[in-house]
Amino acid sequence: MDPDYGSALFWDESGCNIGDFDCFFIGDLGNSTKVDLTEIDGLREWFLEWDVESLYHPNHWTDSQWKDWWERGLKLAKEVKTLMSENVNLLYFTLQDPIWEVRPEEANDGGLFNYGEPMKIE
């Protein structure tokens, strides 16, 4: 679970987008399972906060705002995991230290970078 442009939020192990804040698909094309996310309160809003911030207000959030947003996303990822089969892993993005560092203004890149290893959601 890692937000990106174009409503992309979920990715398979090869890095292909498999869904957004409404649903995602697990499995092979033609034989996949749809995971409906519309009942997860706040997921769409959480994603759209990132989308607006990264596209229209790069580097506008403070470090504490990024941290709060990331922590809310972690809670949402745990809710998403409850809708999935136990044999399917869900990874949530992390950032290396300094965790909440943002790019300089001229980078115009939304603030999140310095990715670390994804966190497995149990």
Residue ranges of model-derived segments:
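Intrinsic low-complexity, intrinsically disordered or marginally ordered coil/linker segments
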Residues: 1-122
